[in-house]
């Protein structure tokens, strides 16, 4: 039995991924305390057990708030759990291990919000107690909502700053582009429609191409052309340095929260 503790947006996204993969509804339980949310989960996942109490199980996904992880982990002491996947931001593996007596395999992961539509980018790190089977189990869950890479735990803060917070950077870019279109005379509706498709199309082109982002950029940047003028303005305003500063600030904050 696999218990997903926390039936919020990310927890329910993982359940959808599991059900779309090799897991059956009978193999999954969702643990959720909020009564209103329980009703919503029962409506969406008709054949999945939704409960306020964690059943005995050998596998757990921790999808609760970071501040609740230690308390929830302590409650798993007598549940028979042998492997845990935590997606709680900033909570170190050692903190989870110290809350549960015995030898438990703990994997810590950092997904991002596109996981809600099965297009997430996740990074994971395994504890010393993990074997190949534990790692494969965690990967299988995360692959249900997108892609996954393995990194050392100390790099998960950098992952948080880059891909964890990254969707917000992209959405801010979208806001700025829409506003720029309006400033040049387009209606907000037209500008919004163009920018949304711009981001979708460019992302798909990047994902499906064997070329680097730099190569793709240069292909659409003719010397002395319109794109070259726009790129020159971005470079002059230190666009790369601004992005680097944002990722650095988010990484630093992740480290602070993990102390």
Predicted regions and their residues:
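NAD(P)+-binding Rossmann beta1-loop-alpha1 motif at the extreme N-terminus of oxidoreductases
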Residues: 1-50, 59, 119-120, 182-183
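Structured catalytic cores of enzymes that bind and process phosphorylated ligands/cofactors
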Residues: 7, 30, 132-133, 243
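Rossmann-like NAD(P)(H) cofactor-binding subdomain of soluble oxidoreductases
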Residues: 15, 43-124
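Small-residue helix-packing motif on alpha-helices
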Residues: 28, 38, 69, 96, ...
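Internal alpha-helical scaffold of NAD(P)-dependent oxidoreductase catalytic cores
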Residues: 95-105, 121-159, 170-208, 253
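Short pre-catalytic strand/loop immediately N-terminal to key active-site residues, enriched for Gly-Thr
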Residues: 106, 156-161, 213-218
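NAD(P)-dependent Rossmann-like dehydrogenase/reductase catalytic/cofactor-binding core
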Residues: 196-259
